């Protein structure tokens, strides 16, 4: 309950600044604050149950069960991407309020994108693409600048 795991090797591997590391911590804190793991489990169970009932009603047998499991996984990917986007933005605000430079969120994801290459197709990923994350964060930088400036004065 409430623990955050942080792979410290990423600090050296990506040569992260304190501000960039704070963005990761803010992101992970946002997951905990928004209870994403609990929500994802509940959504997954509800989706699985609904698809399983539909499969049985349609008389699809074991093939229907396989399709229901695949459907559950694909449907919950969107929830996961939404959770990641929310955590990026809430984490950005948390870090800005703590006095860390909001622009570090963009440089962090530029480094992450460069390190990971193209990766898998975005529709199969549990996370938004690096380009989408960067675009979303850049669009939200003006919203948190005042929070950062107030924290920097304190």
Regions found by a protein language model. Name each.
Residues 1-154:
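A Zn2+-metalloprotease active-site environment signal
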């Amino acid at each position: 309950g409430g623990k955050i795991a942080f792979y410290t090797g990423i600090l050296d591997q990506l040569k992260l600044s304190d501000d960039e590391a704070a963005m990761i911590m803010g992101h992970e804190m946002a997951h905990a604050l928004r209870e994403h793991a609990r929500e994802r489990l509940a959504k997954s169970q509800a989706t699985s149950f609904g698809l399983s009932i539909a499969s049985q009603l349609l008389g699809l047998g074991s093939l229907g069960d396989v399709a229901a499991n695949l459907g559950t996984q694909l449907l919950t990917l969107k929830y996961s991407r939404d959770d990641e986007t929310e955590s990026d933005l809430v984490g950005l605000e948390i870090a800005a309020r703590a006095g860390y430079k909001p622009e570090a969120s963009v440089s962090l994801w530029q480094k992450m994108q460069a390190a990971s290459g193209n990766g898998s197709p975005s529709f199969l990923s549990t996370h938004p693409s690096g380009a989408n994350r960067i675009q979303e964060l850049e669009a939200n930088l003006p919203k948190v600048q005042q929070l950062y400036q107030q924290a920097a004065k304190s």
